[in-house]
């Protein structure tokens, strides 16, 4: 008796590692090291860079000054308009 192709193929595909060539193992190791070092150095840059202001030293940013200047400018403009209306 001869086995059908379906039975032969199912017997061959029982293990996923059997389909993976041994030459690929160094590639996987190198890619793992590259991804791990990329994550490490990115974290180190974000966490310890003194010139990068993400969370720390937020008061050094000029954003509050710019936003407050716009608010003060609008308030001053509204006061001038009210004074002109009162003069009429």
UniProtKB/Swiss-Prot annotation:
This protein's record includes keyword ATP-binding: no
Matching Pfam families: B12D
Keyword tags: Membrane, Transmembrane, Transmembrane helix
Family: Belongs to the UPF0495 family.
Name the record gives this protein: UPF0495 protein DEHA2C16280g
Gene source species: Debaryomyces hansenii (strain ATCC 36239 / CBS 767 / BCRC 21394 / JCM 1990 / NBRC 0083 / IGC 2968)
Lineage of producing organism: Eukaryota, Fungi, Dikarya, Ascomycota, Saccharomycotina
Keyword Membrane: yes
GO annotation (BP), single: negative regulation of protein-containing complex assembly
Membrane topology of the entry: Single-pass membrane protein
GO cellular component: membrane
Transmembrane segments: 25-47
Family matches, as InterPro entries: B12D
Subcellular location: Membrane
Domain of life according to the entry: Eukaryota
């Amino acid at each position: 008796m001869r086995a059908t192709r379906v039975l032969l193929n199912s017997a061959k595909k029982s293990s996923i590692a059997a389909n993976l060539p041994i030459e690929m193992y160094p590639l996987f190791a190198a890619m793992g090291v590259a991804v791990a070092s990329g994550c490490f150095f990115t974290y180190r840059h974000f966490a310890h860079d003194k010139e990068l202001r993400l969370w720390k030293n937020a008061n050094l940013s000029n954003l509050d000054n710019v936003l407050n200047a716009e608010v003060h400018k609008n308030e001053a403009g509204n006061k001038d308009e009210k004074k002109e209306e009162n003069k009429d």
